[in-house]
């Protein structure tokens, strides 16, 4: 109930901040914090993973991922336990992958419709355009760009 009231992205941010504070990584994280301002629907869908406790545990584990392969391992685990992933869960896993790939390279990534702006650590800005303003096209364009960077 609480998560639906505050929204998944805010909840995730609060959870991530708490986990960082608990693990004393706060100083390191603040230096290279990535600000993702993407207008996409992405969350671990309660229709796929109905048990709150399991979903929260997956959010926690995903927030701790530092390498892309860790996200892929958890993705495989979710598929094994709950079946084929829905679009929102796939997009959430893409967001986690984007955070990992962009960390220590970019300050922020944002979008307005299909226009995507990357702001590097040196404040240099770069604009790219996704095929469309669909969430999956935006995420695909960002991932493709980050893998080239």
Q: Predicted segments — roles?
A:
Residues 1-149:
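Accessory helical-bundle/CTD segments and flexible terminal tails appended to RecA-like ATPase motors
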